Amino acid sequence: MTNLPSHHTAIVGSEDGSLKVAEQVPLPRLENDMILVRNTAVALNPIDGKMVGNLASVGAVAGMDYVGTVVGIGPKVKTASEIQLGDRVCGAVQGMHSLTPSVGAFAQFVGATDIVTLKVPPSMTVEDAATLGSGVGTIGLALFRSLDVPGYPEAPATERIPVLVYGGSTATGTLAIQLLKLSGLIPITTCSPHNFDLVKSFGAEAVFDYRRPETPDEIRKFTRNSLKYVLDCISEPETMQFCYKCIGRTGGKYTALEPFPQFLHTRPTIQPDWVLGPTLLGKPIGWGPPFERVGDPDVREFAIKWFATAQRLLDQGKLQTHPVKLMEGGFEGILCGLEMLKKKQVSGQKLVYMIPQVA
């Protein structure tokens, strides 16, 4: 690790709880399990725009998903695929975090944790690779630990049963559909009609318009009132209510990607849960309630196994990335893109921004 600057440009939390572009931000210090990456591009996630106000940490770097080139490797790094200086890698980091304020994706350099870092296949573009990190981790955690669906991409289920993905046209939704298909299950989903062809192209076997009031009845009919597994990729109060209506008579499991109001848990035969991607690191999470966590070594062990599987799926060309909308504007453009996500102006695409390089 030579000829690197001591400071770089990044998007950080400001005193008023908003995000701002800052220069002269210290580079992440290379930890034992860290890979230092010269950032090439980032993808935006809805959570990136929510890490403001009380969740913002002054001076902490924001952003989760990145892709770039390895410029430093910690002495105890272990990854699913051997990584060397100069390799292209992608993944997700825990941005806007008071315990690790120098780590975030919206920056010229990223300090990535080894076990959740993926080596980018030679045939994959940087724009596509930028979209993978948080989705791969979060959806793996949701499907194969929280829901614990029968089947796994490398050990498909012997019985093809339906699994509902609410919000199938999101980046997490299209990834979930593919992984369910690879696991020998029947992915069914909801989205807007203009995205029906999109989700079918990723493997959805049945698609329903979430806006129609009769859709829960149609899903119960399609699943013969026996649906047991639901992943809610939108995770809002009304979507939880919708999903509960779809689950079969004997109950099942519901997993969201954000916290849900407990009063909406209206069916005792349903086991509700929500997942938080950064728990995969097995380290303490210093965000405020309800996101704070102590490090869980069991989740870390799951992450090691899961990212090894994900790396093999990538290398074999079995994972298709979400459609990308390549945006302009660098760091200032990222701030505009976060506003677009907040206003729900993005559908069926992932916003990706190239990162300005160090002069």
From Swiss-Prot:
Keywords: NADP, Nucleotide-binding, Oxidoreductase. SUPFAM superfamilies: GroES-like (SSF50129), NAD(P)-binding Rossmann-fold domains (SSF51735). The keyword Disulfide bond does not apply. SMART domains: PKS_ER. Disruption phenotype: Abolishes the production of fusarielins F, G and H. It is an enzyme of class 1 (oxidoreductase). Belongs to the zinc-containing alcohol dehydrogenase family. Monomer. This is Trans-enoyl reductase FSL5. It comes from Gibberella zeae (strain ATCC MYA-4620 / CBS 123657 / FGSC 9075 / NRRL 31084 / PH-1) (Wheat head blight fungus).
